[in-house]
Amino acid sequence: MPKILVVDDEVGIRELLFEILRDEGHDVQLAENAAAARAAREAGRPDLVLLDIWMPDTDGITLLKEWSGNGQLNMPVVMMSGHATIDTAVEATRIGALDFLEKPIGMQKLLG
């Protein structure tokens, strides 16, 4: 069962993604910020990370750069945002993100 780490500061987004992914048979971990994501990443490498771009304290792009610089970007990361620009999405893929999902994220978009 693939382990997916969902990192988003919005509780509603975390809960929605948790329900969709769990119902599809995935092992889902939730993190509300970069600090919690770091701890989850240290506890064990997920098979996939869904990472919000805009979060308080440390944003998703900064965390992605950190993982890349530390040699910890050895799992696919899909960035998520409802406010990101094309430039932000391009920057994320240059750093190493696999893809970009625009919020709101529905079941079809997530599982497609």
Which role fits each region the language model picked out?
Residues 44-50, 55:
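Active-site beta3 strand of CheY-like receiver
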Residues 14, 56, 70, 81, ...:
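The feature encodes the CheY-like receiver
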Residues 39, 61-73, 91:
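Short amphipathic alpha-helix used as the core "switch/output" element in two-component signaling
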Residues 10, 53-54, 79:
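The short loop immediately C-terminal to the conserved phospho-acceptor aspartate in CheY-like receiver
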Residues 15-23:
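Charged docking surfaces used in two-component/phosphorelay signaling
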Residues 87, 104-112:
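C-terminal output helix
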Residues 32-36, 59-62:
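Acidic catalytic/metal-coordinating carboxylates
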